[in-house]
Amino acid sequence: MEKTEISDVIIVGAGIIGLAIAHSISQHGRNVQIIERSKPGSGESTKTGGGIRLVHGSEMNIQLSQLSFDTWLHFKKHFKIDPYYRETGHLFLSSKNTNSFLTQVDLLKKMDIDSDVLTKSQISSRWPQLSEMNFSQGIYCEKGGYLDQHRVLRGYLETVTSNGVKIEADTRVYGIIKDKNRIIGVETTSGDYRADWIINAAGPQAGKIAALAGLEIPFISRRHELLILEASAAVPEEIPWLIDVDRQVHMRPDGSGRALVGGFLGHDDPVDPDTSSPGLSEEWSKNVRLEASESFRVTDPESKVMQGWSGLYPGTIDYMPVIEEPLPGFVTAAGF
């Protein structure tokens, strides 16, 4: 007879979202069980640039960033691990003379986020290292930067484990258990698990977990790639995270003259998370270095690559996360 585990809460997915939810719930003494299809913290949460930003195009995403911001600033105090947070700020750049940046800053200021639209001359005056750039305007927000996502995941994992959270790794969910109209558990490759609440925090797999419950939620995944350019790139440490919204390329300093570069370069079509290639594209690597060089004028298109990786941005069609209880006992927390 297969085992049946009973908990207060089951969380599907042990990425940053699932672990953060487990942390919050376990702080209140609840019995939490996480089901993870691979290893905890080994999915898309590690395949990012570690970005922490407050600049978004919607009130919801701005609010979510505001709510989490203090967590990153005080992470070491609460999780006993330094996330190596570095505040660079963000500078969104465009060569187009439109009012969209003014509209964006109005929204940010409405949400109590200090930001400004800067002209080309103001950008050059503030950061002489960027005087060769050819943008007409930029949005600058001083708050925000990047951290080491691996250390953050480790901090969450160690803390939830010490709180008594159980994690069933290398286990796939293939069915949903119902009692009348309420979701009461999941069927997995390791047996059945039942709980008062099931939370779908499965990242790129969230749509498939939702489908098991009979739901059709428009989750999509977009493939992205990132490179670390070696120190000979000599990228100034004082510059902010630079984002060219026209070319869809971005760059930030990564310490000791290194740079992190990435971007969709106009290609952000949805991909199937089960068939998406995990490797790097040589063509993309060449193109992104060229685009970053032409956009920001602080790196060379022939800069050598120290490290690179690809991953998926789990999201939705409109870039808005889904946080809801679509069925009794079943909560969705995905699309971030």
Task: List each model region and its residues.
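Central helical "cap/lid" subdomain
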Residues: 42, 192-240
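Glycine-rich phosphate/pyrophosphate-binding beta-alpha loops
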Residues: 51, 144-146, 248, 312-314, ...
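N-terminal Rossmann-like FAD-binding beta1-loop-alpha1 element of flavoenzymes
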Residues: 7-33
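Dinucleotide-binding Rossmann-like beta1-alpha1 core, especially the glycine-rich loop
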Residues: 50-126, 248-250
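Helical element adjacent to the flavin cofactor pocket in flavoenzyme catalytic cores
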Residues: 140-196
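Active-site lid/adjacent beta-loop-alpha segment flanking the redox-cofactor pocket in flavoenzymes
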Residues: 231-329
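Glycine-rich FAD pyrophosphate-binding loop
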Residues: 26-46
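Short beta-strand to alpha-helix junction loop
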Residues: 63-64, 92-100, 139-158, 277-283
